[in-house]
Amino acid sequence: MKSYCLLLSITLSCCCSAEDLPDPPSIHLNSKYLPNQAEAILTAGTPFTLRCTGASSVHWSSSAFCLLYHGRLVDPIDVQRADPRHTGTYCCGYTNQSLEHLSTWIHLYVKDPADPSTVFVTPRNSPRVKEGQDFLYRCLLTDPSVTNLTFQPEDNIQGSGQHLPVGMNVTVDPQRGALIQDVQRSFSGQYVCSGWKDGRHFISRSFHLLVAPRLPPPSVAIHQNKAVRLEGEKFEVTCVSSSTTHLFNVTWTHLTKKNFDVAVTREYRNSHMYISSTLMIAAVSQEDRGTYTCAAASEDGVTTATTHLIVLDSRFMTTYLKTWHANTKAKNKEISKEIDGNLTANSTSIDIEANRSSKLHMKMELIANVSTDGVHVNNISSSTTVEAYEGLDVILTFVTESYPPLSNQSWTKPTKVNNNNNVTMYQENYSINDTRSEASLLLRRVRQEDHGSYTFHFSNSFFSGSQNIDLRIYRSPSAIISVEKNTLTCSSSGYPVPTIAWYSCPGILKTCGNLTTTESSEADPTSEHDEENVRKLLNLPLSTGGDVTAECIASNQVGAFRKVFHLREHNSAFMSALIGAGSTAAILFLLLLVVFYKWRQKPKYEIRWKIIESTEGNHYTFVDPTLLPYNYKWEFPRDKLRLGAVLGSGAFGKVVEATAYGLGTDDVTRVAVKMLKPRALSEEREALMSELKILSHLGYHDNIVNLLGACTQGGPMLMITEYCSYGDLLNFLRARAQDFMASILSADEMEGDPFYKNMATLYGRLRSDSGISCCSDYQEMQPILGSAEKQQGVQMGGLSFGDLLSFSHQVAQGLDFLSTRNCIHRDVAARNVLLTDHRVAKICDFGLARDIQNDDSYIVQGNARLPVKWMAPESIFQCVYTVQSDVWSYGVLLWEIFSLGKSPYPNVAVDTHFYKMIKDGRHMTQPDFAPVEMYQLMTHCWSLEPTDRPTFKMICQLIDRLLQSNDDTNHQSYSNINETKKDDFKGGKSQRRGEEEEQRRQRGNLWIPLSVTNIYQLS
């Protein structure tokens, strides 16, 4: 009320030019004049009279609780006995509405010294406020001498120290009360107003603030966001709105139109009120086009939805062709012709440059643009040529904007293109949305037999036609030479059409290409060709004067093909044959010697995984894997498997990425396929079959690379396993070592810390100390991304301390599973752990696909190559392999993980000193990033006595507790790592380890002593 009167007074003061306006009313208290905005103090129990005089009739309004509900007050206000609840603002104004801005107000304080509880007067009811609104709690002060006014929780008065809720902004005014801005649900509670006078603390009666939750505004939806109509057609659109309250309405607006024909229906169901508002236009015109907005409004807010109306004066059709194919550059040749119905059809011939990148590029071209005002148009047709490389995907998409919308769309393909054996070689997709339609044809990994004419047919009630696409597949040339009398004919085929050149040179040579040759010009050569075949003739001389080599070279942008013809003199034929036979025999003999030598030098492959048949102490009897049964349910059709890029290769075999169609429940599955190289012997074939049998015997587990299928008949043996896109763990850690170290050091520490200055050196050491010889032809496992993933910008992310613990835990789970299946791995190392795209660690054995002959991780012992630095002492010195020896190797793998991919025993050669160090029980030092618990686990894994080593089940339980602790103390763990790095470089490693041990004891006893007898129950 006071604010309203103040606003009127300010308005009055600004209107100085209005000389004909009367003066504001004047107020008298007990016959004493009080100026505008004056304050007066009364004592409770005394009478008072307020009188207002002015140029015309006046009326009163007041914020006093005693007079608040009296309705319109009349002059004068006569009170026989003043009460503290008469405290408030009294405003007098003219009853004439044109003079409402002229008003006068005063504020009365009615204090009662005998009753301290009346220092504040408050409403009798607890307020209920809606969330998000401002709220004025009128705790009115009756004694202006009370100062230090505050608004606070009631519990704070009792000494609990409770403060206002977070985000509560309160302004206390002695004349108005406490204004709370933007009330939130967290503000609910008991509050009081308080103040101080002469050392005494006065508080108001407490009140309970109830905050009603803010209701969402009504929902609104228009299912048709765009509509197209011809002039004179009917248009209807329905807007559906719903809310939990009945108090909302729905309205339509348009930029130019004001009046609408609207039908409204209401329905209450499921505790919601639904309002459907349908806007109707009987015959649209150009004035009706534009955006129509449907607004649903309530006291909780306004929600809108729009639809756009397009008004056409004639029917139309516009068609585009989008082609997705390999990285190409199109060279367009436009051909235009007139067709009935004011149609211009454009066809484009596309020439593709020789770039075999698998990244897809899109090109869009206009095919047809037609309009008609009522005549049916037929024969909307044109032709387009698309060229593609064999083995790549091609996507043909026709995009049509038309009115009326298309009612029929279809593709016809060459008869030889079909989906055989339930393998989808092509896929059609159709969509129609309002006036826009799309028809796509996906051809997967096109082959030569896929070339030909592809036709798209379309129609609606006014337009019909077809678009033809001539698909050409690039093909490298082939050539043959035929002889007829004295004429050589070189016939070549390929696409693009090859270019043929004849060359001749004296003597019998393999090729004329390395000599100074000239194109034959004896007799004019003739040529003839069609789109894919070409012939060129060469006339031979009647007398050659010796042996002559004629060479035909056919080439196009895909490749070149050479064909040689030897013309011999008769007297030299026998000598040439004799020389040729002798040379061939000598070459064959040398080749046999080389092959025999290589065969003697080639290491015999042995599969690392072993299945235990029985045990007697430390003596294990292993199952011969060749005797394991093979279940032919694993067989998978070869024609449903498309091989891709090589993931890894070795001396005996390789692993390639592949796509399997119809494997399991998925239509398309990305897999890895292990296969033998062509020069592999029967021993390698038997080894791969043994590995297949072992995997099928083990069964499924999340943390091993699981078998998905196999092809053992009708061709080379293929073993199909899960695909792990991140490659092996070793390279994964090394690739992210620098980012991991940077993430655990703050920017300030990096500027002055000597560790940061040496990061590049350390990173270089991580990269160079790989254990792979520089002369090795072994291709390490690498992640390969498909084209779709590249387009989406797949980010493989960084590396965290939690990731290191997770990898350790998952590998332990996988090895625990192997131990329960009586399986010994014998080559546990980071290089034999793969990561999926979700960073799931899976144990594998590269086996045939790892070149151990050129891998420095494998050391020659006798006639075998062994991973000595990962092997347990009993395996090195006694050739004993047990589950406990896998535990030793797992400890070395942990060292690899927490050193971010360093090679174990860095800078230590495998010699007599190394073997003595192993026998003496000397361990590697704690890795840079390993907590105390993990290093203790490593040392327990390296116990000289195998039975003192922990079981994999115990290891899983320990790391599981560390993972849970890491979630709770993630920030603290990184702080410890930062301190660790500084201490290592500053010589304080022992002190740091003592501090970490103390922190470990404070966090709780996560470590359980693992030096207990390890007895695996093998059954």
UniProtKB/Swiss-Prot annotation:
Q: How does the entry describe its membrane topology?
A: Single-pass type I membrane protein
Q: Enumerate the spans annotated as Protein kinase domain.
A: 641-963
Residues in the Extracellular compartment per record? 19-576
Q: Where are the transmembrane segments?
A: 577-597
Q: One Pfam family name from the record?
A: Ig_PDGFR_d4
Signal peptide range in chain numbering: 1-18
Span list, region Activation loop: 845-867
The protein's name is Macrophage colony-stimulating factor 1 receptor 2
Which organism encodes this protein?
Answer: Takifugu rubripes (Japanese pufferfish)
- Taxonomy of the source species: Eukaryota, Metazoa, Chordata, Craniata, Vertebrata
